[in-house]
Amino acid sequence: MAQSKSNPPQVPSGWKAVFDDEYQTWYYVDLSTNSSQWEPPRGTTWPRPKGPPPGVNNEKSSRQQADQAPPPYSSQSTPQVQAGAQAQQPRYYQPQQPQYPQYPQQQRYYPQQAPMPAAAPQQAYYGTAPSTSKGSGHGGAMMGGLLGVGAGLLGGAMLEHAFDDHNYDGPDTVVVENNYYGDDAGGSDGGFDDAGGFDGGFDDGFDGSDF
């Protein structure tokens, strides 16, 4: 407990009271032995401090604070005040949102897709039949050759017959029955040219696509 420096204690003879500023208390020195101690020696008295004790001042201050404080509200008055305050304030009602029945979530049905048709079998590839034009060409050439040979033989026979008539019959005038010699009566030239002779037969038969 802190002690006051202005109120020194009264010690017996042979003792001295010294105030310690660091600890704010008194310690006592024995003058005969020059030793010090914190405990007061026997016979030490303390003078009465000036002014009223601290407890009286505290009671007065607490009484003054109690007089100045506002009167407490009773338990009956508090609900009335609150009821009046509630009556003055307008009441706002928030409309409740209608609750709709919850239906189970519908599951969408997706039809299964039909399986993809199997790939159509590939058509077998058949090579085109060899054209018979070449064969027909050979046949035509052969037929042309035969016709040419026949015409040549026929023309030669008629030419020989004409020479025989010209040499042995005597008359200068040559009678042409079927006009085999052409219009100009060209003799051998007309016979070979009109009938085709060997030229036409060989040209058609051997100059074609056979070789």
Swiss-Prot record:
PTM sites of type Phosphoserine: S75
Domain WW: 9-43
Database matches in SUPFAM superfamilies: WW domain
Entries under Pfam families matching the protein: WW
Keywords assigned: Apoptosis, Cytoplasm, Isopeptide bond, Mitochondrion, Nucleus, Phosphoprotein, Ubl conjugation
Region (Disordered): 32-116
GO cellular component terms, A-Z: cytoplasm; mitochondrion; nucleus
PROSITE patterns in UniProt: WW_DOMAIN_1, WW_DOMAIN_2
Crosslink feature (Glycyl lysine isopeptide (Lys-Gly) (interchain with G-Cter in ubiquitin)) location: K50, K60
Biased amino acid composition, Low complexity: 80-116
Principal cellular location given in the protein's record: cytoplasm
Protein localization: Cytoplasm; Nucleus; Mitochondrion
SMART domains to which the protein is assigned, alphabetical: WW
Alphabetized CDD domains for the sequence: WW
Keyword field contains Transport: no
One Gene Ontology term from the biological process aspect of the record: apoptotic process
Keyword hit for Cytoplasm: yes
InterPro entries in the cross-refs: WW_dom (IPR001202), WW_dom_sf (IPR036020)
Modified residues (Phosphothreonine): T78
Functional description taken from the UniProt entry: Involved in apoptosis. May play a role in nuclear function controlling cellular proliferation coupled to mitochondrial biogenesis. Causes impaired growth when overexpressed.
Other remarks on this protein: Present with 6020 molecules/cell in log phase SD medium.
Assembly notes: Interacts with metacaspase MCA1.
Protein name stated in the entry: WW domain-containing protein WWM1
Native source organism of the sequence: Saccharomyces cerevisiae (strain ATCC 204508 / S288c) (Baker's yeast)
